UniProtKB/Swiss-Prot annotation:
Residues 176-229 are annotated as: Disordered. Keywords: Activator, Developmental protein, DNA-binding, Homeobox, LIM domain, Metal-binding, Nucleus, Repeat, Transcription, Transcription regulation, Zinc. This is LIM homeobox transcription factor 1-beta. Transcription factor involved in the regulation of podocyte-expressed genes. Essential for the specification of dorsal limb fate at both the zeugopodal and autopodal levels. Residues 56-106, 115-168 form the LIM zinc-binding domain. The gene is Lmx1b.
Amino acid sequence: MDIATGPESLERCFPRGQTDCAKMLDGIKMEEHALRPGPATLGVLLGSDCPHPAVCEGCQRPISDRFLMRVNESSWHEECLQCAACQQALTTSCYFRDRKLYCKQDYQQLFAAKCSGCMEKIAPTEFVMRALECVYHLGCFCCCVCERQLRKGDEFVLKEGQLLCKGDYEKEKDLLSSVSPDESDSVKSEDEDGDMKPAKGQGSQSKGSGDDGKDPRRPKRPRTILTTQQRRAFKASFEVSSKPCRKVRETLAAETGLSVRVVQVWFQNQRAKMKKLARRHQQQQEQQNSQRLGQEVLSSRMEGMMASYTPLAPPQQQIVAMEQSPYGSSDPFQQGLTPPQMPGNDSIFHDIDSDTSLTSLSDCFLGSSDVGSLQARVGNPIDRLYSMQSSYFAS
């Protein structure tokens, strides 16, 4: 927190000795150019005995006139010594800045210091108040909240280019620290107002626990309800700049009929609201990303667990395919022949009806190794068929 010092002259802010910035030159001397009297000799005509001629600072040409102008230890032609802005001849005094000369009126118009409060020019003869790099009129050096003029010895704070006295700064600090982020906006929309209404049966409980140790007798802050037109004007100005200067706030206050303090608090709350929305959006994005990442990790783990368990192979029923016999292609019954009626006491089927016949159904399924032995034991089935036929007709 700074302490205001006494008023000082503007010339102390910009000393004359700084040649690189600007300085006022009070004395413009006119000197007579020294010429050698009498008839000119041959050496003078040839230039061997001529003194070194003065060079004009403006046009950089030698000065051959009888009179020349001396400014800041430099020589000028009389016609070259003029204002760089209005081209008027300079006779008594001038201002020097960036190797150029200016008259008093043009210099004050172009390079005069401006008040940081009203943005108007400050005359060189006025007393000013300084705060860091800012310069103020005596009347403009006041608090932006209570508009009390700050004098020598008063404590103040320069915040965002605005002056605040000690009392208002502490009030604003307490106000910003006491307001929660959810209630930072003094002007709520209709849907937000509906969400802020407490439920029945919770009113007394919220009153008792809402202050968190603060004085319950502390009066509530006045609440300003903005109209649609005022809100539109504020939002349009906020889109241009979220931190308007004092002049813009005063213009908005005059247009909307509100005080400058209300305008300032609205912009502060709006900035806090935008920060809160941006923070909430960022949290939602992070939550969605974490959920998506968790689902991907869970699915990958499930796939890994399923891949670790190999599926059980279905029990393969060992079905023994019956080998195709050599007579499969030449079926004796495919030409419509009816099988002969065999007598029951035929010696050929005696072994089949005996005890050594098939004992179970499983004996019907023969492996490939059993087929050869069966053929060797029984013989060629076609030969057996012919023998059966011949024996039938013989009987």
